[in-house]
């Protein structure tokens, strides 16, 4: 079990937000924390602790001025910690290698692959071929829609016709190196992880999986470690001390390693 750090960038600033509140219109989101430091500050912090494999997400819509501001922050962080961070947000087969060349270890993809509500195999194969599976993370972030854990796209605003399941993970494993799963209903709320999501991930072992969403206590971390027998890596955002929360990051790191 590893602790995977995160850097969420919105409107050119490092933030922690309530995931379900994101709106492209007006570039709005409910904010838990806005940092006075830039993304490279956090990248250096993670590099000093040898925390590889963290994810950095641009939470603005591609093609907007806000995206460009966030993109600049992203490049600064990659320069500060080359090969230490995975990057998501506006990634396509056409620009994926630009992020790899800039220092990302992996690119993280959702909307490009799950377009118009369905799995787009042509796009999946294109991006796999562009960067190779070894540099690709598929984000299967999900939300409970009428009792079904539904894969969400476009900064968690649009639902697909796909249900998160071990069968879906198995089907996609040959195309990627890892999976990232945000439990959108829990993201940014610090009210505990979403057990129904973890129950799907707990026995999956074909690829590395990182869970994010709602982790708020050290007991939450222990529970995930026990449930997944150490196979599920975790990300903590709003509850972490570096983002204004109450969990000490160094203690979290030690707990995950032990």
Regions found by a protein language model. Give the residues of each.
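Short beta-strand/loop segments at the ligand-binding rim of alpha/beta enzyme cores
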Residues: 2, 78-87, 133-137, 148-156, ...
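Conserved beta-strand positions in the central sheet of alpha/beta enzyme cores
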Residues: 55-56, 108-109, 137-139, 180, ...
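C-terminal helical cap(s) of enzyme catalytic domains, especially alpha/beta-barrels
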Residues: 119-130, 222-258
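Conserved anion-binding
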Residues: 10-11, 16-25, 100-186
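Glycine-rich, proline-tolerant flexible connector loops at the mouths of alpha/beta enzymes
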Residues: 53-72, 111-117, 181-190
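Catalytic cores of alpha/beta
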Residues: 73-87, 91-106, 196-234, 250
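Conserved, mostly hydrophobic/aromatic
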Residues: 8, 46, 54, 99, ...
């Amino acid at each position: 079990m590893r602790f995977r750090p995160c850097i969420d960038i919105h409107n050119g600033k490092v933030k922690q937000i309530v995931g379900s509140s994101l709106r492209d219109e007006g570039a709005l989101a409910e904010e838990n924390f806005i940092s006075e430091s830039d993304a490279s500050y956090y990248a250096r912090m993670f590099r000093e602790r040898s925390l590889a494999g963290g994810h950095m997400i641009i939470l603005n819509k591609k093609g907007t001025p806000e995206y460009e501001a966030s993109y600049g922050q992203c490049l600064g962080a990659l320069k500060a910690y080359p090969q230490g961070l995975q990057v998501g947000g506006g990634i396509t087969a056409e620009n994926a290698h630009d992020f790899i060349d800039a220092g990302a270890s992996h690119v993280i993809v959702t909307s490009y692959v799950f377009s118009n509500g369905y799995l787009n195999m042509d796009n999946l194969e294109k991006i796999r071929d562009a960067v190779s599976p070894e540099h690709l993370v598929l984000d299967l972030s999900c939300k409970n829609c009428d009792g079904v854990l539904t894969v969400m796209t476009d900064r968690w605003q649009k639902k697909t016709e796909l249900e998160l399941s071990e069968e879906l993970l198995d089907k996609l494993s040959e195309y990627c190196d890892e999976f990232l799963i945000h439990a959108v209903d829990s993201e940014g709320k610090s009210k505990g992880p979403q057990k129904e999501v973890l129950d799907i991930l707990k026995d999956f072992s074909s690829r590395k999986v990182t869970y994010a969403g709602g982790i708020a206590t050290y007991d939450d971390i222990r529970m995930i470690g026990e449930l997944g027998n150490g196979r599920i890596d975790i990300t903590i955002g709003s509850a972490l001390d570096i983002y204004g929360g109450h969990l000490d990051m160094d203690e979290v790191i030690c707990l995950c390693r032990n």
